[in-house]
Amino acid sequence: MNRYQKLCKKLIPFKKGCFIPFVVLGDPSIDMSLKIINALIENGADGLELGIPFSDPIADGEIIQKANLRAFNSKINLHKCFDILSEIREKHQTIPIGLLLYSNLIFKFGINKFYLKCYKIGIDSILIADLPIEESYVFRKYAVINNILPVFICPPDAKKNVIKNIAIHSQGYIYLLSRSGVTGINQEIMIPPLSLINKLKKLTKTPLIQGFGVSYPYQIQKIILSGISGVICGSIIAKLIENYFQDDDKLIKEIIFLSKSFKKATIIIE
């Protein structure tokens, strides 16, 4: 049983969903990035989705693009990202850790070499933002060889054959999009079509986790009530960093408040 399965199995009897924050490694600095991640885990986060900074993050809106720029300004690189990841895994042994990145970073490092490095660090899953499932065979092959769980994005308008492929090959969780487009902060409650949720649940036991625009506790409560296992929240965290990165104490206080309130919202109230 992988860490995602263990997490969901632990939460279901208590009628809780999982809260997975997304943070760009190195934002706003290497040291502060670690402090933010630790504060999230210690105050409610059930798992982590961590971004490797990239110069052209095409799936991301302005807020996450700025987070990538701040990370590059902190002199982050892939090897420093691996060091941060090793430190997080050493401190937090049981929490699921996923990476979100772009395919060119893996190509440049070497596909097998990258997955092997992630396995040695203790990474659970990898989601490649610009990789359609139809073109994923080589990446899936090396993920499986190196005991890394591949994760794929399922858009709300996915066709039948795409849904089936995602259900077969997405192993850590299935990343359900709230909407088409790029990442960002939203005030609306956007839940993927119930027909899509039910179709995926018939095809697989892999947890369904929703992301893109999940920004407030009231949204999270509705999402969990719809039968989705959890949420990924990134832009709202990156916006806090953007607003308070020059005041470390204030930033950590805001992160702690967010983590506690978002986790509380995953508890189903009937």
UniProtKB/Swiss-Prot annotation:
Reactions catalysed: (1S,2R)-1-C-(indol-3-yl)glycerol 3-phosphate + L-serine = D-glyceraldehyde 3-phosphate + L-tryptophan + H2O
Superkingdom to which the source organism belongs: Bacteria
Keyword terms of this UniProt record: Amino-acid biosynthesis, Aromatic amino acid biosynthesis, Lyase, Tryptophan biosynthesis
Active-site feature positions: E49 (proton acceptor), D60 (proton acceptor)
Enzyme Commission number: 4.2.1.20
One CC-aspect GO term: cytosol
Any matching Pfam family: Trp_syntA
Pathway: Amino-acid biosynthesis; L-tryptophan biosynthesis; L-tryptophan from chorismate: step 5/5
UniProt xrefs under PROSITE patterns: TRP_SYNTHASE_ALPHA
GO terms for MF: tryptophan synthase activity
Subunit structure: Tetramer of two alpha and two beta chains.
Stated family: Belongs to the TrpA family.
The protein's name in its UniProt record: Tryptophan synthase alpha chain
